[in-house]
Design a protein with these regions (language model features):
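Short coil/loop residues immediately preceding or within conserved phosphate-binding loops
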Residues: 50-52, 87, 123
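Signal-transducing coiled-coil/dimerization helices and immediately adjacent hinge/linker segments
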Residues: 169-193
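Sensory beta-strand/linker motifs that couple input domains to effectors
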Residues: 132-142
């Protein structure tokens, strides 16, 4: 399954002409297939499992991580903007290393909720590095704890260089300069919501 997901991501992204749509095409197979979707989860009454995915790009002024290619995020957070050193996106940028959080509750006091709809229980962050420079990160999160697995983490790490290459090849660096700052920016503080 892993090779087919990567292949699907690459083939889909190659047909896109807009950088953000190319990133979304890379992420869509992961968003649709990774993680546990059917187990009995330890979720509050009336809450069901759901996933989000996207790419947080470093803005041209280096002040923010800006959400693009969002999947599953609320529409008003289409351009969620997290301060550059905020939360786990800031940690991934600082270290340049991918981050796997099977249970965000295990990160006592460290996990910051930026998603408006819910606190996510599992999360993956994989850096997009282009020619030695950190340009952003792809992310995926699940509402339920322990529902993203090491195999999902490995696939997201493998997808991150593909995402970076596709984004740059489609003119993403220039696209970001032209569209920044976004009119629909949803800025949050480092502390989260």
């Amino acid at each position: 399954m892993s090779v087919s997901i990567l292949e699907q991501a690459g083939v889909s992204a190659a047909t896109e002409t807009i950088p953000e749509m190319a990133l979304r095409a890379v992420l869509m197979p992961f968003y649709n297939n990774l993680g546990d979707r059917n187990s009995s989860f330890d979720l509050p009454e009336g809450v069901s499992q759901f996933f989000v995915a996207g790419a947080f790009l470093v803005t041209p002024d280096q002040d923010w991580h800006m959400l693009t290619a969002s999947l599953g995020f609320p529409s008003e957070q289409n351009r969620l903007m997290i301060p550059i050193d905020g939360g786990h996106p800031g940690r991934v940028r600082a270290t340049g290393e991918a981050l796997y959080l099977p249970d965000t509750n295990a990160e006592a006091g460290k996990f910051k909720q930026y998603l408006k709809t819910a606190r996510m229980g599992s999360a993956i962050y994989a850096p997009m590095i282009w020619q030695g420079k950190f340009i952003g990160q792809i992310v995926m999160a699940a509402r339920a704890r322990n529902s993203l697995y090491p195999k999902d983490f490995a696939l997201m790490r493998a997808a991150a260089p593909l995402a970076a290459a596709v984004y740059v090849a489609k003119g993403g660096l220039e696209w970001l300069v032209k569209m920044y700052p976004p009119v629909d920016a949803y800025k949050v503080s480092p502390e989260g919501l």
